Amino acid sequence: MIVCIDIGNSHIFGGVFVGDQIKHNFRYPSTTPCTSDTLGIFLLSFFERKKLDIEDIEAVVLSSVVLHLEYSVNSACKKYLGITPLELKPGVKTGLKLDIKNPLDLGADRVANSVAAISLFPSRNIIVVDFGTATTICAISENKTYIGGAILPGINLSMESLSQKTAKLSNVTISHPSSALGKTTISQIQSGLIYGQLGAIKEIINRISQENFIDKPPILIATGGYAHIFEKEQYFDVIISDLLLHGLRIIWQMNK
């Protein structure tokens, strides 16, 4: 078994691989108090519920965009699973070339997404949209080079901003609206959140494609916690909610 873990702004998201397939996954809120012990006990409980033997774990691979949680997760894996994780940091082999001004600023999550995308669609131009706390857009050229991207507020972040900065607008269930024309305040917020996000993404992707991929249109991949909401739009070529974890598994294979 290979355990792949991503420390995100909202959740610690993990998957247990057997071969190249995720057999089990877990989420732990990264906004709650997280010590090595609380996380370690959570992991042991998860493996016990799934009837998995921690002795069968061959490796743990870790990516993070939340610096202050890295120590706790790392320590939990060492103390409770008996394994020192491979952390996706500079110096780890990825097979990904970077054509950006500050390579060290690129988030580990975006590196892992890009690696997985290249594995799925070698020799193709690719754009990956990750619907997380922030929505990130990554452009990868056909020669396995990350050439840049865009970042915008995620759907939940946009909703929280509305509820916190306005007097009469509250949080709503994030779901695909039945119509762009809302008949209630709730449905109007949902329309604005979903179609506003989709419209922004389409415009950014269109401009990136015109500027960089005019001769070979890119494959469009959606991933992240809110990717499934856009399924019925049939805009993306493929939706893979756990793309990042697959990228971590591939990176482990390159470095073992």
Curated annotation (Swiss-Prot):
Coiled coil: none annotated. Belongs to the type III pantothenate kinase family. A monovalent cation. Ammonium or potassium. GO terms for molecular function: ATP binding; metal ion binding; pantothenate kinase activity. The keyword Transit peptide does not apply. It catalyses: (R)-pantothenate + ATP = (R)-4'-phosphopantothenate + ADP + H(+). ATP binds at D6, I7, G8, N9, S10, H11, I12, F13, T133. Pathway: Cofactor biosynthesis; coenzyme A biosynthesis; CoA from (R)-pantothenate: step 1/5. The active site is at D109 (proton acceptor). It is found in: Cytoplasm. Catalyzes the phosphorylation of pantothenate (Pan), the first step in CoA biosynthesis. Homodimer. Keywords: ATP-binding, Coenzyme A biosynthesis, Cytoplasm, Kinase, Metal-binding, Nucleotide-binding, Potassium, Transferase. Its cofactor is NH4(+); K(+). This is Type III pantothenate kinase 1. GO terms for biological process: coenzyme A biosynthetic process. GO terms for cellular component: cytoplasm. K(+) binds at D130. It is an enzyme of class 2 (transferase). Its EC number is 2.7.1.33. Substrate binds at G107, A108, D109, R110, T185.
